[in-house]
Amino acid sequence: IFPRPVLQPPKMRPLTEEETKTFFEKLSKYIGKNITYLVERSDEPHVFRLHHDRVYYVSERVLKKAECVPRDNLSALGVCFGKFTKSGKFRLHITSLDYLSQYCRFKVWIKPTAEMSFMYGNHVLKAHVAKISEEAPEHEGVVVFSQTSDLPIGFAVTAKSAAASAKLDPTAIVAFHQADVGEYLRNE
């Protein structure tokens, strides 16, 4: 009988070059060159760290304080931006919405009657759109805002460019749902 290998729990570590490339490609679909504002902050330096296939955005000060926590006891640290799937793709989580909305390039505002539909996981239809960023291209990330409160409620990927979506019929999909604030309740 062979002894069983003792598996060490994964510790929080910097992203590899390939992981960084995949992560930044996905993030740039939503915030473009504004990634530099996340990486090169003037107020307090922040870093991206990988832990249990999830990417966290954490300040270096908090990271140094967390070094004394045993890795068995560390479940999360900072803001979770998303996770890597088993196939190696990166999927953004709703927890990154505050940063995406702050630095996003393209926005979609939806009508109050469509907010619940979007928050139940449905795509954004032409009839739901109150306003869209004029220069939004096809298959690009957008942050979805409420028209009444101007608060971010999720993010999506455009199905057509803003110019092309103006000519669509009311039942056509303008943006494909990716994540919304209703996930907090649905996933619990």
Language-model regions: role of each:
Residues F2-E188:
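Accessory RNA 3′-end/elbow-binding domains used by RNA modification enzymes
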